[in-house]
């Protein structure tokens, strides 16, 4: 992974420390969300898309691309620990009502071949290999995410707080 060298962040940090806590938290939450956007876009591009079978379509409301559509960014301010948290989430119930409970299986573990039995019938499931899409997205877009977060802070301080950020240079070494 390439090193990221950002010049001028000491000035940004000093100015951020002088702001009220609520305003600082809002800026940092926005910066973290901006930093996660390139990673989210790469995860959406890498995400495997397939048709669900009829049973899963009925039981869980699945549709083609439900896993891809369940990728989202969440951000909040934890008042107890005074920190900003941003997460890139995949799975769970999506906006369209599909329950993508299997996201961790596709990303991490896959499924071993096994047999299924019901009503005196037996079927062999061939299993599947994991198809990671979140980790490769993070690996490929980490630098762009850091630059996007720093750029967001720079623009936000210039527009909303009147700080002259023209001398702050951002770039990858």
Predicted features and spans:
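Small-xxx-small helix-packing motif
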Residues: 8-9
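Exposed beta-sheet edge/beta-hairpin loop segments within beta-rich domains
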Residues: 126-148, 157-158
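Short, low-complexity, charged/polar segments at coil/turn and helix-coil boundaries
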Residues: 2, 14-17, 23-125, 155, ...
């Amino acid at each position: 992974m390439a090193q990221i060298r950002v010049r001028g962040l000491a000035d940004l940090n000093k100015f951020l420390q002088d702001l009220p806590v609520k305003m600082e938290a809002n800026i940092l939450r926005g910066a973290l969300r901006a930093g996660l956007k390139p990673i989210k876009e790469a995860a959406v591009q890498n995400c495997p898309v397939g048709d669900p079978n009829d049973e899963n379509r009925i039981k869980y409301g699945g549709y083609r691309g439900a896993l891809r559509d369940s990728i989202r960014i969440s951000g909040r301010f934890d008042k107890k620990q005074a920190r900003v948290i941003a997460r890139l989430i995949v799975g769970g119930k999506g906006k369209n009502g599909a329950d993508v409970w299997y996201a961790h299986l596709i990303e991490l573990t896959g499924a071993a071949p096994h047999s299924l039995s019901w009503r005196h019938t037996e079927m062999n499931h061939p299993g599947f290999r994991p198809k990671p899409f979140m980790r490769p997205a993070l690996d490929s877009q980490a630098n762009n995410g850091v630059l996007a977060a720093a750029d967001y802070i720079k623009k936000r301080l210039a527009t909303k707080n009147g700080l002259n950020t023209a001398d702050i240079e951002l770039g990858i070494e």
